[in-house]
């Protein structure tokens, strides 16, 4: 069923946002690929799909969802998965990703990406759900580590141990969100480099970079600001460990002009290139 574990690096991408549609089509900026928010394109017809078709003609796209709720105790939402599959057949995505989390229970959506307990029981619950989703979609799914603000007393493993074991058992891939690692390390007091060291190199398909909000005692993953220096430094160490992984910039609020995001993407290229040169030296 599956191809080799991960695709070769696709370079450096941006999250596709509505305010930039026209400029992207008109100017064809130097972006290697775009990541789309899956849920924005699940309704047939309308402007979002019109613009996506035009942009897809010039750029590869990856699909990134927020509604799979793979960690929920509710049954998998097959209507949602069918809609995802229809969109995938239309756009031929590089890969399909979502989050290692739960978003609701008993049919109610909490509109947040909530962490799960890192236990053997949770692994046994998640693996068949991931396998079923992958079988239905016909591809490995790529699961992202979420930022977290609470933890469970029941947890038996670290987050990175859990993620590594889950990827192995379910034969899925990992979207490594470097900002989320930084946020969770700050909030819970663990070593971000230990997280990186615990993730299997062969499972990392993509890296996310984003900004956050520092509230003093804790920080929140808000995607509303540029990437800060400590996150760039963590990204450099991630590239040294995992190699030239496909990387992209997320911005979901206070979205700046496209030119500013292109400058930030150039910074990602520069950081990655320096990290690879240091690793090769």
Report residues per predicted region.
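Boundary/entry segment of secreted carbohydrate-active catalytic domains
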Residues: 1-24
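Distinct, well-ordered alpha-helical segments
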Residues: 21-25, 152-168, 184-197, 259-262
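Acidic-and-aromatic substrate-binding clefts and catalytic sites of carbohydrate-active enzymes
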Residues: 22, 38-50, 69-78, 149-154, ...
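Acidic (Asp/Glu)-rich catalytic clusters
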Residues: 23-29, 46-63, 79-94, 133-136, ...
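Conserved, mostly hydrophobic/aromatic
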Residues: 34, 96, 141, 177, ...
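Gly/Pro-rich active-site loop or hairpin
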Residues: 45, 75, 113-117, 123, ...
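Active-site acidic/histidine proton-transfer and metal-coordination neighborhood
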Residues: 77-174
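C-terminal helical cap(s) of enzyme catalytic domains, especially alpha/beta-barrels
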Residues: 258-280
